[in-house]
């Protein structure tokens, strides 16, 4: 199983308490350590302000980080979990992604979803249409991404977006395009879009849920005449590991104190626990067909989970 890890960027309050003039260096230090420990990839979220509630604490923007980290790392693949389609025109976004793939030497993962954080939409002046409309917009965006990365003068006219000879040079180094992750677990539409267009899917579920999503994806693949085995099924979840129960309790107490997330939330997560427990659960995911873990490590700034998890690299 491949493993990637998020850098701290503030969205989940992981830069709280870090002085503003030290925040970028903290992000860089985490990226460097992820690379030194032989992780497959680093990841960032695409959000503008903190969760679970908006605060004045910092949140660094997704594609700004992608561009910068493409120049400060050498071998890590670079992903977003996941780009919110609604926040950027898809032709512009494809242009940005193509540039970063070239700038990074062909290391970009292109992960996108329909968007969900309604408070953020409203705060920044974006329309927040129904889920059905957001998913239709996502499908048009996926089509534009594939056209602009593979054709010289692509033309497309949809209900929400259109391009007319949208030149995209330089093309990405990866052919036909950087791997396309269609993210989200919606079983009727999102998994259908994954079956039609995607190279990878990504879900935040327990092992039983992972098996269920996989079975539904296979049904969609059968209907779309898509080879099910072509699609990588991946997991994104919190990972927090400690050597003993007292240390785990202390970590969770600290996290809860500055995120205001109840301690029970952390104890219920499938990959939070002692080393043997977490590694055994990961093995269960692997047996269920998971090929890639994208780990959000909430103690990455101050704890040792990144080091412990790296034993599997």
Where are the regions that the model predicts?
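Internal, glycine-rich beta/alpha segment that forms the wall or movable "lid"
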Residues: 86-197
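Alpha-helix-loop-beta-strand connector modules within alpha/beta enzyme cores
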Residues: 55-79, 137-144, 148, 307-313
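Active-site mouth loops of central-metabolism enzymes
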Residues: 9-25, 83-91, 176-186, 239-240, ...
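An alpha-helical appendage that flanks or caps ligand/catalytic pockets
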Residues: 7, 132-172, 204-291, 300-307
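Short, acidic/polar
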Residues: 21-34, 93-96, 184-196, 250-254, ...
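Hydrophobic faces of well-ordered beta-strands that scaffold small-molecule active sites
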Residues: 3-7, 42-44, 77-80, 108-112, ...
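Conserved, mostly hydrophobic/aromatic
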Residues: 34, 38, 46, 69, ...
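N-terminal beta1-alpha1-beta2 module of alpha/beta enzyme domains
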Residues: 1-72, 176-178, 296, 300-301
């Amino acid at each position: 199983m491949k493993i990637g890890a998020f850098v701290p960027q503030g969205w989940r309050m992981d830069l709280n308490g870090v002085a503003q003039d030290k925040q970028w260096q903290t992000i860089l230090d985490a990226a460097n350590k992820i690379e030194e420990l032989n992780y497959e990839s680093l990841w960032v979220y695409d959000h503008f302000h903190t969760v679970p509630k908006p605060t004045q604490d910092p949140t660094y923007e997704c594609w700004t980080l992608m561009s910068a980290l493409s120049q400060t790392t050498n071998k890590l693949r670079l992903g977003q979990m996941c780009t919110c389609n609604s926040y950027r025109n898809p032709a512009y976004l494809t242009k940005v992604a193509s540039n970063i793939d070239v700038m990074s030497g062909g290391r970009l993962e292109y992960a996108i979803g329909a968007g969900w954080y309604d408070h953020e939409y409203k705060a920044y002046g974006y329309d927040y249409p129904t889920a059905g409309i957001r998913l239709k917009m996502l499908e048009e965006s996926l089509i534009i991404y594939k056209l602009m990365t593979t054709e010289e003068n692509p033309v497309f006219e949809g209900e929400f977006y259109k391009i007319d000879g949208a030149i995209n040079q330089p093309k990405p180094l990866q052919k036909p395009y950087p791997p396309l992750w269609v993210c989200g677990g919606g079983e009727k539409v999102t998994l259908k879009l994954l079956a039609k267009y995607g190279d990878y899917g990504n879900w935040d579920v327990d092992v039983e849920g992972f098996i269920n999503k996989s079975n539904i994806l296979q049904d969609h693949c059968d209907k779309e005449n898509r080879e099910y085995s072509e699609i990588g099924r991946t997991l994104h979840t919190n990972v927090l590991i400690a050597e003993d129960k007292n240390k785990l309790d202390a970590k969770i107490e600290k996290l809860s104190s500055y995120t205001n997330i109840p301690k029970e939330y952390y104890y219920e997560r499938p990959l939070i626990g002692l080393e043997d427990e977490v590694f055994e659960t990961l093995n269960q995911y692997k047996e269920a067909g998971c090929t890639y873990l994208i780990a959000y490590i909430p103690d990455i700034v101050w704890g040792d989970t990144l080091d412990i998890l790296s034993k599997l690299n």
